[in-house]
Every structure is written in C-alpha cells, then in structure tokens.
Amino acid sequence: MIERLDVVEEPRKEWDLRMEIASAPRSGAVVATLRDAEVRRGGFTLGPVSLQIDWADRVAVTGANGAGKSTLLGALLGRVPLTAGQASLGSGVLIGEVDQARKLFHGEESLLDAFCAAVPDTEPVEVRTLLAKFGLKSDHVLRSAGTLSPGERTRAALALLQGRGVNLLVLDEPTNHLDLPAIEQLESALDAYEGTLLLVTHDRRMLDAVHVTRRLDVADGKVTER
C-alpha cells in the first residue's frame, strides 16, 4: 500500500506541480499598526515608527544588513517588545511566517510525521501530495526532518503555510537556500496569493518579479516609505 502511494504521489519531475499558498478568510481592514514605536537593542534604535498595514497590502521591506528590517517585522507582529510607543494586530489576522515554520522540521521524526503533527486534520495521503507540490518527493517524506537541507526545509515550511492557510504572509529573505526553479515557483505563488504580504528581500530579481503595492526602506533604524 505504501509503495502504491509513493508511485501515485510522485511528481514526474521536481516542481512539475504548481506551488500555491492558500489564503485564509480575510482579516479586518487594519492588519497591523505601529504608533511612535521604538525598539532599542544595545546601541541600535529602530524608530520612532508610525505605520499601518491594511488588508491586501503587498509590502516590500528593503535595506542593508543590520538596518533593522527584521526588527521592524518583529515589532509589527508583536514578537519584539517595544521600548516606547504602541503596536497592535487587527482582528482575524492569521500569520504565516516561513522562518517560524522552518523550526518545526529539525527533529528526529520523519518529515511526514512532523508535517502531519502540524496539520492534524489533514490526511497523510494529502500531506504527501502537498509536499510533492513543493518538490519534496517520496524519498524526502520518510527521512528524518533534521536531515533536510536548508532549501528543503524552506520548501517544507512553504508547504505548511499552504496547508494551514494564512491571511498575513511574512517572508524574510525567502530566496536564501532556494534554487532558481524553486524561486520562480515561489514568485508565481506570491503573485496568486490574495492576502496581505510582508516581503523582506535584498533579491532585486524577486523585487522586480513580485507585484507589491508599497515599499518600505529601512536605513540606520529609520523607516521611509517610497
């Protein structure tokens, strides 16, 4: 039975099946807000920042390494404590973060078992099909999740977001560790995604390929919309 499933689930070649990222039911009109927000860490200060992200905004966040891009994301999502000001999330916001999802695939259990534990209402056969869409074939699903390469772990995380459905998709340098076919599939999936998007990237190709409605530039802890 398992062998038969492997044959049915196996795509003819990697990335043959179309990658998608499912949208959950929409959130409220206001997704996230910062009001005079500041974050101080050692000698670094982000802000003060006043910023509102609305439903279906597609926001690219750019800036040099160490400029404060990830700190800005953490402040918006309520993960980074503020030194001053206020942060709030809107009603009905379902956050999907690739970096957080990747952390679920580091243990000794198989990729299939780890994935099924994260989406308990999804049948294993459906999980196999979903993973195959993201280039993780039958020889990946029974391996220990901890043996996945960084790129395979990112694919598994993207597949998990597809399985769960999100309405605020957060991607922090998503092209790291992905090969070109995977990047192209991701770009296509992002174009079809209908929720709110926060995309942090220094990849000029992705910035040109993915439709965004707003751009935030972070430099020396200051945030400028352009």
Segments predicted by a language model, with ranges:
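ABC transporter TMD-NBD coupling linker
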Residues: 1-18
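ABC ATP-binding cassette signature C-motif
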Residues: 15, 22-226
